């Protein structure tokens, strides 16, 4: 009987050859590119007079630098306009499909690719973006890569990689009402640490994982990188197949039946051996909020800010630095902390179900005085479907701004930024110093529904209070 993990199976299937020094040449089945990490890669190809090996296996979109308030061309930021124009030119030159401004399929790369059915079980996926691990939700092995590796994939459709160890994170039970995939992954990162996954691929499994929707699974895998893992994945199942079926790039007819048969064979075998295994109880997890400057510095809504003096010695200094930077006092509750800005969006939580859950909290309420709150759909498709459901009107009526798709305030590469010492309640994935555009800006990570609750009350709030009403 086979005793292999999904990671083993996908790795072996895409292995081209062993390289001197012990690494492996790995074929990449899907290469996603955007405007930020691709220009230098294309320049390197041009210098060496190389073409793109398999243009049909590369797909491009624009997301990081696009303004979300006005996407009329040319952009008011000349650098952003230049980056977009460069990507357009490179895609045209090399015959790469580009989902650009004005396209009904444009969006944040890790949102739009799954929507189109581009991401499928058993694939290897690469993109010049840290959160490429998102695609592991489909039973793919997905890596974020640097610019030089983007060049290598364009030129050869392969990468030199070292095989990872595999840690299975088994989550028992079922998430409570008001607890979401974002809370679960923040809890996992808190438990294992931001460096706990170094050298590992994370396999997320167990009843609590299996009960998640595909969009929830994408949230989980999206943030595997924040726990130090090189990638994260979930075994494909009927939930996966139902999501993919009928999408533009999904197999059709007899090819669909063949694909299903193969996809089912990919799941880790019952006798598979893992390098490490962790078991958690999903039913005990509460709404979770970060208080510090790493995604691992998270606590449940009912806890207080940790006192650095009572933490392990290797965590004390960073906790002290975090408290000072965030202007939060040890032993004070996180619930009730005031906020200035609320952001719902990003490749972590900018999908339709995220907006739906947040809208349930917002409906019939009003954004608190002095709070700036905005919603940024993850793609044109998300925006269209949200409008069809009337979600935009719910948010607008409550006092939120409704924006065009893009990465927005997840990172400081477009006009959506914090100012000065503002503190945000954000559904994004990173709370590093300066991450949201101001060198002194502060970020509290939480689920979209928790962000919505914070916007209504003007402070960190247990979303479950709204769900009881």
Swiss-Prot record:
GO biological process, one term: L-leucine biosynthetic process
Residues where [4Fe-4S] cluster binds: 347, 407, 410
Keywords of this entry: 4Fe-4S, Amino-acid biosynthesis, Branched-chain amino acid biosynthesis, Iron, Iron-sulfur, Leucine biosynthesis, Lyase, Metal-binding
PROSITE patterns in UniProt: ACONITASE_1, ACONITASE_2
Cysteines joined through disulfide linkages: none
Catalytic activity: (2R,3S)-3-isopropylmalate = (2S)-2-isopropylmalate
Cofactor(s) listed in the protein's UniProt record: [4Fe-4S] cluster
Pathway note: Amino-acid biosynthesis; L-leucine biosynthesis; L-leucine from 3-methyl-2-oxobutanoate: step 2/4
A single MF term (Gene Ontology): 4 iron, 4 sulfur cluster binding
EC number: 4.2.1.33
PANTHER family for this protein: 3-ISOPROPYLMALATE DEHYDRATASE, HOMOACONITASE, MITOCHONDRIAL-RELATED
Summary of subunit composition and partner proteins: Heterodimer of LeuC and LeuD.
Family: Belongs to the aconitase/IPM isomerase family. LeuC type 1 subfamily.
Protein name: 3-isopropylmalate dehydratase large subunit
Organism annotation: Prochlorococcus marinus (strain NATL2A)
């Amino acid at each position: 009987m086979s005793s292999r993990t999904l990671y083993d199976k996908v790795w072996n299937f895409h292995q081209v050859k062993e390289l001197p020094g012990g690494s492996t040449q790995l074929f990449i089945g899907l290469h996603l590119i955007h405007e930020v990490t691709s220009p230098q890669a294309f320049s390197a190809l041009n210098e060496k007079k190389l073409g793109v090996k398999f243009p049909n296996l590369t797909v491009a979109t624009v997301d990081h630098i696009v303004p979300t308030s006005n996407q009329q061309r040319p952009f008011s930021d000349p650098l952003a306009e230049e980056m977009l124009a460069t990507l357009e030119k490179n895609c045209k030159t090399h015959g790469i499909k580009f989902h650009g401004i004005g396209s009904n399929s444009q969006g944040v790369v890790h949102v739009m690719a799954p929507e189109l059915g581009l991401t499928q079980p058993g694939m290897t996926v690469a993109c010049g973006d840290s959160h490429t691990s998102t695609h592991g939700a489909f039973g793919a092995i997905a890596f974020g890569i640097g610019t030089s590796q983007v060049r290598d994939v364009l030129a050869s459709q392969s990468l030199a990689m070292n095989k990872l160890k595999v840690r299975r994170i088994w989550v028992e039970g079922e998430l409570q009402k008001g607890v979401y995939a974002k809370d679960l992954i923040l809890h996992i990162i808190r438990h294992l640490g931001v460096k706990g996954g170094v050298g590992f691929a994370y396999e997320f499994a167990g009843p609590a994982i299996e009960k998640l929707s595909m969009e929830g699974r994408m949230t989980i895998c999206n943030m595997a990188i924040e726990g130090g893992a090189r990638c994260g994945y979930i075994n494909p199942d009927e939930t996966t197949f139902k999501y993919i079926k009928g999408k533009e790039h999904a197999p059709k007819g007899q090819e669909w039946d063949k694909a299903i048969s193969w996809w089912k064979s990919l799941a880790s075998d019952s006798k598979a051996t893992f390098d490490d295994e962790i078991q958690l109880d999903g039913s005990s997890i509460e709404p979770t909020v970060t208080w510090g400057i790493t995604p691992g510095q998270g606590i449940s809504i009912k806890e207080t800010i940790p006192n650095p003096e009572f933490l392990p010695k290797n965590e004390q200094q960073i906790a002290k630095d975090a408290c000072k930077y965030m202007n939060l006092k040890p032993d004070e509750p996180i619930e009730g902390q005031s906020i200035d800005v609320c952001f719902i969006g990003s490749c972590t939580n900018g999908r339709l179900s995220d907006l739906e859950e947040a809208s349930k909290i917002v409906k019939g309420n009003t954004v608190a005085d002095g709070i700036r709150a905005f919603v940024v759909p993850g793609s044109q498709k998300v925006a269209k479907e949200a409008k069809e459901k009337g979600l935009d009107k719910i948010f607008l009526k409550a006092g939120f701004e409704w924006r065009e798709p893009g990465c927005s305030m997840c990172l400081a590469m477009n006009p959506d930024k914090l100012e000065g010492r503002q503190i945000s309640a954000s559904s994004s994935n990173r709370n590093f110093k300066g991450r949201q555009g101001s060198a002194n800006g502060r970020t509290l990570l939480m689920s979209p529904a928790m962000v919505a609750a914070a916007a209504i009350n003007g402070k960190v709030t247990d979303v479950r209070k709204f769900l009881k009403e």
